[in-house]
């Protein structure tokens, strides 16, 4: 509690780390740090999660027009299917020790810089392609990330012109992000 006349300030990194401590350590959730840091920092950033538990944050600098164009290519839909993120993430964590899963994760990490460059250069088609390839790899990480209904929604979006699509969060349901030319919305 702040004393009278004193203002307590917290920085974004502290807020992200405290959110992780609560979910990971206190609640014992088998999750990563991405969501907490994204919420704490806001905006467009590259987050690099290091082996020593530190996090490097690199803002992606684009002008307002580019940000508007980037946003215009995205559509987010709630597709239902409430699920337990913990069970999917727990399974994914166990599976990620397998060599083929490690390679998929390394490939997904390798997309980060190319995705940032595609945003900076306004290469929206490449953004969609990277999102799509990322989703393809994500589905291979564990059972339960996708299902026939999610695959059907994905196929429908692609059929109607989406360059890429992915499920947000752990998988199994929730929100589906499509990245497509605005005229295809």
Residue ranges and their predicted role:
Residues 3-30, 34-167, 177-185:
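C-terminal nucleotide
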Residues 171-173:
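Glycine-rich nucleotide-binding loop
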């Amino acid at each position: 509690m702040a004393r009278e006349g004193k203002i307590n300030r917290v920085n974004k990194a502290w807020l992200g780390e405290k959110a992780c401590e609560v979910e990971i350590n206190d609640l014992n959730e088998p999750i990563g740090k991405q969501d907490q840091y994204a919420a704490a920092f806001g905006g467009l950033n590259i987050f690099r999660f290091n082996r020593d538990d530190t996090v490097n944050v690199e803002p992606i600098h684009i002008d307002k027009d580019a940000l508007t164009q980037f946003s215009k290519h995205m559509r987010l839909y709630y597709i239902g299917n409430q699920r337990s993120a913990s069970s999917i993430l727990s399974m994914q964590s166990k599976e990620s020790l397998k060599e083929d899963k490690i390679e998929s994760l390394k490939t997904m990490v390798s997309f980060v810089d190319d995705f940032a460059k595609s945003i900076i250069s306004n290469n929206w088609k490449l953004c969609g392609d990277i999102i799509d390839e990322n989703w393809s790899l994500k589905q291979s990480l564990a059972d339960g990330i996708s299902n026939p209904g999610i695959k059907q929604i994905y196929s429908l979006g692609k059929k109607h012109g989406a360059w890429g699509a992915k499920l947000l969060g752990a998988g199994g349901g929730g929100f589906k992000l499509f990245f497509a030319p605005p005229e295809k919305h």
